[in-house]
From Swiss-Prot:
Pfam family, one: tRNA_m1G_MT
Summary of subunit composition and partner proteins: Homodimer.
The keyword DNA damage belongs to this UniProt entry's keyword annotation: no
Name under which the protein is recorded: tRNA (guanine-N(1)-)-methyltransferase
Localization (cell): Cytoplasm
Function text: Specifically methylates guanosine-37 in various tRNAs.
Molecular function in Gene Ontology: tRNA (guanine(37)-N1)-methyltransferase activity
The EC number(s) this enzyme carries: 2.1.1.228
NCBIfam families reported in the protein's UniProt record: PRK00026.1, trmD
Entry keywords, A to Z: Cytoplasm, Methyltransferase, S-adenosyl-L-methionine, Transferase, tRNA processing
Residues that, per the record, bind S-adenosyl-L-methionine: G110, L129, G130, D131, F132, V133, L134
Species whose genome carries this gene: Clostridium perfringens (strain ATCC 13124 / DSM 756 / JCM 1290 / NCIMB 6125 / NCTC 8237 / Type A)
């Protein structure tokens, strides 16, 4: 997958040079490039923002440099243009799975009080992380790209790495344990030490369902419970 990020602050995405995403880039599974929107402004002072018409606090990103940056990237990349903003569709795991199937994606990060409305016709999709405000689109773009990238084949090395995680199948993840067997008087559940794979699978499924029911009842209501799920929930 190839990802282009249009931003005023390319250095904020240096985080993708490290850890799993960094290794995936080195191994050729991901290609992430940043494009500085400021490089496309025609303003001799490299200015990319101005006061809003009608008054109001803050500054608004001017349309020319953003549109020219999008057009330049689109000449070589045909991916969807995605804007991170509060009016967008709320991002979730299902959206991450769908976007991970794309060969190319182009992200546009807004800043200040937003982007001139006349730029919006160039966006194929608008995404929001939720009902809260961030200092810029970059802060929202990072987790979105990370969530999508880790689902790209080869990035994690194995599909099992993400299939057991929270949200993948509409439930929260079951509890995880590692050494030591006993810590501060609390022991690892015996079933995990049994070596009985079927019993371990059932225990994990039950815990996943119980945790989801307790902490995210909104998610639990959407789960299509199997006969086994119902039996597990009734068991002690």
């Amino acid at each position: 997958m190839k990802i282009n990020i249009l931003t005023l602050f390319p250095e904020m995405f240096d985080i993708f040079k490290h850890s799993i995403i960094g290794r995936a880039r080195e191994n050729g599974f991901l290609h992430i490039e940043t494009v500085n929107i400021r490089d496309y402004t025609l303003n001799k002072h490299k200015k990319v923002d101005d006061y809003p018409y009608g008054g109001g606090a803050g500054m608004v990103m001017t349309p020319q440099p953003v549109v020219d940056a999008i057009k330049a990237v689109k000449e070589k990349n045909k991916g969807k243009v995605i804007f991170l903003g509060p009016r967008g569709k709320t991002f979730n795991q299902e959206m991450a799975k769908e976007l991970s199937k794309e060969e190319e994606l182009i992200f546009v990060c807004g800043h200040y009080e937003g982007i001139d409305q006349r730029v919006y016709k160039y966006f194929d999709l608008e995404i929001s992380l939720g009902d809260f405000v961030l200092t810029g689109g970059e802060m929202a773009c990072i987790p979105v790209i990370d969530s999508i990238s880790r689902l790209v084949p080869g990035v994690l090395g194995s599909e099992e790495s993400f299939q057991d995680e929270s949200y993948y199948d509409g439930t929260l993840e079951y509890p995880q344990y590692t050494r030591p067997f006993e810590f501060e008087g609390e022991k690892v559940p015996e079933v995990l030490m049994s070596g009985h794979h079927e019993n371990i699978r059932k225990w994990r499924r039950k815990q996943s369902l119980l945790i989801t029911k307790e902490r995210r009842p909104d998610m639990f209501e959407k789960i299509k419970l199997s006969k086994e799920d119902i039996k597990l929930l009734k068991s002690k």
